[in-house]
Every structure is written in structure tokens, then in C-alpha cells.
Amino acid sequence: LWKTSGKEPPAQVQAFGSNALFGLDISGWNSPKKIKADVFKKNSVDFIVIKLTQGMSTSNKFIVDQMKELRSSGILLAPYHFSSAQHSRENNFKRRAQKEMDIFSREIDKHFGGKPDLTPSIDFESGHGGRRHPKPYGLTVRGHNLNVRFHLELARILKRRYGKRPLVYTANWARGSYFSKADPGLLAEFGSE
């Protein structure tokens, strides 16, 4: 669950009760200039989901350098992988998924000793690839299907490696589009009221 700072939690968050965990996403583009674990703890942050990899590259040196302070404060850390599904095609998506998960697993081994505090996560996106691939391929039925197949392959690989299904970390739009039967026990909101 994400806790919206300084506001009364929305009704759907309150429904989880006092046992709910509240967390943040920290990636290279949304990191504060300095991580202050005591400020996070004071604001009831229980966990932080950290982007360790994106596509075929490692991506978050900033947070990795500060993981020790966060862990010693009692904040749980969970790695996530931001996939580059838009680089996959029908004939190579399994190979591409394997390569991405090999890099992600290597980073989990390196920074978590292979045992993260929480289950590794996959950031499920629309297939938008930034400046080089500005048009989401998910706008077509074929693109949507490939996007889902790619992410399912990522999930299969992670389950084989870690013995648990990964968390799927995504925006509300994807939950409605792709995960209508998903467990509502996890809720993430970004930039919404």
C-alpha cells in the first residue's frame, strides 16, 4: 500500500485496517536528494520498493548506496524490475525476458544476498519506451497480448528462482485493464487524489 503523505488515507486503504503496511517507490527519477530513514520511519513508512533494474541495465545506484541506512532503521526493502517489454517481439520475448531476469537476479544477489526482505516485483507498464520508442505498442490487441505474455514470462522465471510468485507493481489503469481478478490486497497509487 502507498500512504499519501499528510492526508487521511482513502477509504480503500482504511479498509485494510491496522495491519496494513505502507510503502514508497524509489527509483532513479523520483528519488529525493538525500534519503533520511528517520523521516520515513516518522511518517510510518514500513517498506520501500526499489527499482534495481530496467530492461537490460542496472538503474538505481543512488538508493543502493543508502540501503544500509534504510535497513538498519527497520524499513523493509523490496527490489523491482522495470521491464522493457517494448523491445521484445513474438520471436524473441522469452529470450528477452530471460536476459532481463538474469540481470535482475544478479542485482538481487549482489545487494540482498539473494534474499530480499519482500518478494521481488515486476513493474507492469504499457510498453511505452520513452524517446526512442514513444508510441506504446500496447495500443493494439497484438501489442497488449505480447505485453501480457512478456510479463507472464518474467513472472514464471522469478517464481522458479525464488519459489514465490512475484508482486506485480503497476498503476491503477493496468489493474482495471489486465488484473480484474487480482487480489485487491495490494494497492498502489501514483500522483492521484
What are these regions (language model features)?
Residues 4-161:
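Substrate-binding cleft of extracellular glycoside hydrolase catalytic domains
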Residues 77, 164-166, 185:
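Hydrophobic anchor at the start of a short beta-strand
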Residues 159-179:
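Aromatic-lined carbohydrate-recognition surfaces of secreted/lumenal glycan-active proteins
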Residues 88-96, 175-186:
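Glycine-rich, charge-decorated loop segments at or immediately adjacent to ligand/cofactor-binding or catalytic sites
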Residues 106, 149, 183-193:
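Acidic, His- and aromatic-enriched active-site or binding-groove loops in soluble protein domains
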